[in-house]
C-alpha cells in the first residue's frame, strides 16, 4: 500500500500543476495530524477560481490539488503565518521538479523579490522557505545530514543528483551513460541498476525489466540486453510524459496504489481511472488521511469511555464494600441481641470493675480467666477509647454465625446494638446513592459509545466530503450581471481586462470605462440588439461601482462608453501600453457624476440560480432576493458570513460571494 508518491508521480503532478501559474496566493494553512502535516496554500487562478494546493509530509508524502474539505485550525501555526506574511497575494510564476527527484520548487513573485517554497518528499519530508539567493528563511523541520543542513540562514543544497535524467533519453549520450553504468557495475542485479541510474523506485524498475523481457535479477548483461532495457526505459517514460492513464489500483476492495499509467505488475487488479493524475492522488490520500483523523477521534472517545469505565469500576468496588459493611453491621447488631443478657452482664461487670481498679488489673483478671463463660469472650481492650472487643456467635437457619464485635463500655447492650443498626442504615442509604450513580455512569458510557459512533461517522463523512467544483460559465470568470436581459461583463484586473477586450468583445457590443485610473472595462453583450437609455444608466452605475472608486469611498465619478472599434492595443508613437491597457480613440459618451450604487443578490439566469451584483433598480426588477451594499472597512470575512446566512437557501458558498463583491471592503445597508 503506497504512502508516498514516487519521483515518477512527482513528474506527473508537477506537469498538471502548471495550470496554477500566474495564480496568486491568498492564504496558507498548516494542519498537524498525528502522523503527518499538511501545508495548504489557497491560490486564486485568474480564469480558474480558487484552488487548494496541498503539500503533505510525514507518513503520507504527496502534493496535489484537493477537492476535499479539511478542518483548518483557527489559529494558524507560526510557519503558516510566516508564509502569509511574505507571500500574501504573491504570484506563482514557476513550478519545477528538481533533477527528476522527489523535490519540487514553487517560485513566488512579490514586490520584494522572488521567494521559493521547496517541498522534499523523501525521508520524513520537509517544506523549506527560501529567499531568491536560496538562503533558508525557515524550514518546517530542522534537519542535519553529513552533506547538508536544513537550518535557517544556511544556503539550501539540493540532494545529490542521479546519473541519468529521464527527460534527456532522446540524446545519444544518454544511451552511452546508461550502457557505461551497467558495464561498470557488473555483478549487480539489473533491476537495482535501473533503479539507481534513474533514481526511480522498484515498481518502475521492475516494469522496465518486464517490458524488455529480461529477468529483473539477471546480472552481467550483454550490450544487446542493455539496449533492450534502454529502449524499454524510453518507452515507459514516453508513456508517463505523453500518454497517461491516471488510476487508483485496488486490492481486496481497498486502495492499494495510485499510478499515472497501466503497469504490467497490476494486470488483473481492479482499477479506478481518472481524467487527471492530481484528482487520482487527491482521492487516494484523502481516503487514508480520513482514517488517520477518524482513528485520532476514536482514540479520544475511547479514552473518555475508559475514564468512565474506571469510574464505574471504582463505584462497583465501593458498592460491594458498602454492602459488605452494611451486612456486617447488621449481623453484629443481631449478635448483640442474640446474646443480649451475656453482653449486658459483661458490660456491667467491666463498668463495676473500673470503679474499683485500673485497666491493668482488669486486663490481668481477664487473662487469668480465659475459661470463664463470659470473661473468656473478651479478645481485646482498647482502654483509650473505652472499647472492648468480644467474640459472639449465634445460630441462624441451622448456620452458626460468629463475629468479633466492638462494644462501647459507656453504652448498654441495647445502645451498642442500635449503634450497629444505625451504621447499617446509613450504609444502605449510601448504597442507594451509589447505585444511582452507577446507573448514571453506565448510561453515560452507553451514550458515549453511541455518540462516539455517530461522531465518528459524521467525522468520516465530513473528512471524506468532496467539494463539488461548480462548472462555471465563461462569463463567471469576470465580474458580471444581467441588466434588462443584457449580459454585462467586467474585468477584475489587468489580465482579465485584456482577455475581455481581445476574446469576449464583439463588434456590436458597448464598452464602458470609469474615468479613474485602473478601472475595468465593462462590456454590454448586445447580440445585435438595441440598448435603451435606462440600461445604459444602470450599466454606468455597475461600471463605476466595480472600479477603484468604491475602494476609495467615492460617492460618484464620471464614466463613458465607446464602441469596440474605438479600442486599440496600438500605442501612440513613443509610448508603451502595459498589460490590460488600451488606447481609446474617437468620441466618448459620458455619464457625469454617476453614483456608486450597488447591491448583491440571487437571480435566475442561464438555467440556474446565481449570485451577483447589480445597481438597486435592477435588483428590484429582476432579482429573487437581494441586499444593498456600501463601501466600508468592515472585514470581508464577516460580510461573507452575513451574506451566506442571508442566501443560505440558494446553495451559495463563500467563493461564490467573494467572486462577485466589489473591490475593497463593503457592508450591508439594507436587507
From Swiss-Prot:
Any single Gene Ontology cellular-component annotation? RQC complex
Q: Which organism is it from?
A: Methanocaldococcus jannaschii (strain ATCC 43067 / DSM 2661 / JAL-1 / JCM 10045 / NBRC 100440) (Methanococcus jannaschii)
Protein name per the record? Archaeal Rqc2 homolog aRqcH
* Pfam families found in the cross-reference section: NFACT-R_1, NFACT_N
Q: Which Gene3D superfamilies match?
A: 1.10.8.50, ibrinogen binding protein from staphylococcus aureus domain
Q: Which UniProt keywords apply?
A: Coiled coil, Protein biosynthesis, RNA-binding, tRNA-binding
The GO biological-process annotations, alphabetized, read as: rescue of stalled ribosome
Q: Which residues form a coiled coil?
A: 291-363, 410-465
Q: Which GO terms fall under molecular function for this chain's record?
A: ribosomal large subunit binding; rRNA binding; tRNA binding
Mitochondrion as a keyword of this entry, yes or no, is no
Amino acid at each position: 500500500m503506497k504512502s508516498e508518491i514516487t519521483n515518477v508521480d512527482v513528474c506527473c503532478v508537477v506537469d498538471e500543476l502548471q495550470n496554477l501559474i500566474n495564480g496568486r496566493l491568498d492564504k496558507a494553512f498548516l494542519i498537524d495530524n498525528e502522523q503527518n502535516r499538511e501545508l495548504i496554500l489557497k491560490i486564486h487562478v485568474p480564469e480558474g477560481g480558487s484552488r487548494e494546493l496541498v503539500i503533505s509530509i510525514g507518513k503520507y508524502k504527496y502534493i496535489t490539488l484537493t477537492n476535499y474539505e479539511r478542518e483548518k485550525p483557527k489559529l494558524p501555526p507560526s510557519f503558516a503565518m510566516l508564509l502569509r506574511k511574505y507571500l500574501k497575494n504573491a504570484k506563482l510564476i514557476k513550478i519545477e521538479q528538481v533533477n527528476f527527484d522527489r523535490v519540487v520548487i514553487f517560485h513566488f513573485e512579490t514586490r520584494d523579490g522572488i521567494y521559493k517554497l521547496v517541498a522534499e518528499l523523501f525521508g520524513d519530508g520537509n517544506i523549506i522557505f527560501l529567499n531568491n539567493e536560496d538562503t533558508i528563511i525557515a524550514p518546517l523541520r530542522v534537519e542535519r545530514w553529513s552533506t547538508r543542513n536544513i537550518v535557517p540562514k544556511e544556503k539550501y543544497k539540493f540532494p545529490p543528483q542521479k546519473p541519468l535524467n529521464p527527460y534527456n533519453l532522446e540524446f545519444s549520450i544518454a544511451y552511452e551513460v546508461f550502457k557505461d553504468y551497467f558495464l561498470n557495475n557488473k555483478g549487480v542485479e539489473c533491476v537495482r541498476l535501473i533503479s539507481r541510474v534513474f533514481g526511480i523506485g522498484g515498481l518502475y524498475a521492475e516494469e522496465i525489466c518486464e517490458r524488455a523481457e529480461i529477468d529483473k535479477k539477471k546480472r552481467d548483461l550483454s550490450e544487446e540486453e542493455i539496449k533492450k532495457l534502454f529502449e524499454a526505459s524510453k518507452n515507459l517514460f514516453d508513456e508517463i510524459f505523453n500518454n497517461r492513464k491516471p488510476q487508483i489500483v485496488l486490492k481486496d476492495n481497498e486502495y492499494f496504489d495510485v499510478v499515472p499509467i497501466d503497469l504490467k505488475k497490476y494486470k488483473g487488479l481492479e482499477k479506478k481511472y481518472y481524467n487527471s493524475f492530481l484528482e487520482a492522488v487527491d482521492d487516494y490520500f484523502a481516503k487514508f488521511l480520513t482514517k488517520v483523523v477518524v482513528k485520532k477521534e476514536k482514540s479520544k472517545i475511547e479514552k473518555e469511555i475508559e475514564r468512565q469505565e474506571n469510574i464505574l469500576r471504582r463505584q462497583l468496588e465501593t458498592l460491594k464494600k458498602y454492602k459488605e459493611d452494611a451486612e456486617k453491621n447488621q449481623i453484629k447488631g443481631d449478635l448483640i441481641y442474640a446474646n443480649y443478657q451475656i453482653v449486658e452482664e459483661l458490660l456491667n461487670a467491666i463498668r463495676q470493675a473500673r470503679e474499683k481498679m485500673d485497666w491493668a488489673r482488669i486486663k490481668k483478671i481477664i487473662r487469668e480467666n480465659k475459661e470463664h463463660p463470659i470473661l473468656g469472650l473478651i479478645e481485646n481492650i482498647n482502654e483509650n477509647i473505652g472499647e472492648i472487643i468480644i467474640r459472639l456467635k449465634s445460630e441462624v437457619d441451622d448456620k452458626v454465625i460468629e463475629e468479633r464485635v466492638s462494644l462501647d463500655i459507656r453504652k448498654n447492650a441495647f445502645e451498642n446494638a442500635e449503634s450497629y443498626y444505625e451504621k447499617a442504615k446509613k450504609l444502605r442509604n449510601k448504597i442507594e446513592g451509589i447505585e444511582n450513580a452507577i446507573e448514571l455512569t453506565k448510561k453515560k458510557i452507553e451514550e458515549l459509545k453511541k455518540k462516539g459512533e455517530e461522531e465518528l461517522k459524521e467525522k468520516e463523512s465530513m473528512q471524506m466530503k468532496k467539494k463539488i467544483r461548480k462548472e462555471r460559465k465563461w462569463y463567471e470568470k469576470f465580474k458580471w450581471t444581467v441588466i434588462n436581459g443584457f449580459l454585462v461583463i467586467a474585468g477584475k484586473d489587468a489580465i482579465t481586462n485584456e482577455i475581455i477586450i481581445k476574446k469576449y468583445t464583439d463588434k456590436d457590443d458597448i464598452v464602458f470605462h470609469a474615468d479613474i485610473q485602473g478601472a475595468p472595462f465593462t462590456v454590454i453583450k448586445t447580440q445585435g440588439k438595441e440598448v435603451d437609455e435606462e440600461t445604459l444608466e444602470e450599466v454606468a452605475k455597475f461600471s463605476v461601482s466595480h472600479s477603484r472608486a468604491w475602494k476609495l469611498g467615492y460617492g460618484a465619478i464620471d464614466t463613458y462608453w465607446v464602441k469596440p472599434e474605438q479600442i486599440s492595443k496600438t500605442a501612440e508613437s513613443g509610448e508603451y501600453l502595459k498589460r490590460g491597457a488600451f488606447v481609446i480613440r474617437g468620441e466618448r459618451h459620458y455619464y457625469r457624476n454617476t453614483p456608486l450604487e450597488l447591491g448583491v443578490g440571487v437571480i435566475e439566469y442561464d438555467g440556474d440560480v446565481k449570485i451577483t451584483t447589480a445597481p438597486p433598480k435592477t435588483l428590484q426588477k429582476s432579482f429573487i432576493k437581494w441586499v444593498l451594499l456600501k463601501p466600508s472597512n468592515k472585514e470581508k470575512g464577516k460580510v461573507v458570513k452575513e451574506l451566506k446566512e442571508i442566501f443560505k437557501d440558494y446553495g451559495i458558498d463563500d467563493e461564490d460571494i467573494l467572486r462577485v463583491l466589489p473591490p475593497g471592503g463593503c457592508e450591508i445597508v439594507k436587507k
